[in-house]
Amino acid sequence: MNEKNIKHSQNFITSKHNIDKIMTNIRLNEHDNIFEIGSGKGHFTLELVQRCNFVTAIEIDHKLCKTTENKLVDHDNFQVLNKDILQFKFPKNQSYKIFGNIPYNISTDIIRKIVFDSIADEIYLIVEYGFAKRLLNTKRSLALFLMAEVDISILSMVPREYFHPKPKVNSSLIRLNRKKSRISHKDKQKYNYFVMKWVNKEYKKIFTKNQFNNSLKHAGIDDLNNISFEQFLSLFNSYKLFNK
């Protein structure tokens, strides 16, 4: 994604009142180190530096980097990096959290990047509401990949009126909490295969008819359109047993 396309997709929240309402749902303290995805004009960055130990803002737009630095001139616990988040290398040897009001058009790429390429223990993102709902939909491959690594929660609605320019849809503040991976390293490839066959409804490629019926019964599934992640893991574990 080049700089021009990302700039044209940005929607800013600048009202102190609205920012404060969002920040009340984010667990931060003076010991936290934060990576901010897209500092924009620095309005959220300012709130973060006042609450946290250190903030690293990653912003692809050079002009917005300067705007953010000027807004934070009275603070020294931050740095603004003029980089593309999709190319950024997160540290592997320190504790940190991530916050971002991320562009709608690259939300999937960003969320994959930060879940699979960072070690952040808590991630807070403002995303399009429909996208947030898809992250909780076990009929979606992205949701099934993410749920193996993080617990996903929708914390609050963020009305479209908060933004400028005003988008056509509302947004949500979501939280991703890191957990011990539910899939062992040796099973990752097998899990990826199972997920893709499942979401494409290619059941015959992963189960015989009897295996499928027994697996559904063992998982307590009555409706294929309404299964929990735990039930999905039960299906995957059955698949592994049948394919030792």
Swiss-Prot record:
Q: Which transformation does this protein catalyse, written as a reaction?
A: adenosine(2085) in 23S rRNA + 2 S-adenosyl-L-methionine = N(6)-dimethyladenosine(2085) in 23S rRNA + 2 S-adenosyl-L-homocysteine + 2 H(+)
This protein's record includes keyword Metal-binding: no
Changing Y104A has the effect of:
Loss of activity
CDD domains documented for this protein: AdoMet_MTases (cd02440)
EC identifiers of the protein: 2.1.1.184
Assigned GO CC terms: cytosol
Please list which residues make up the signal peptide.
none
Q: What does this protein do?
A: This protein produces a dimethylation of the adenine residue at position 2085 in 23S rRNA, resulting in reduced affinity between ribosomes and macrolide-lincosamide-streptogramin B antibiotics.
Name recorded for this polypeptide: rRNA adenine N-6-methyltransferase
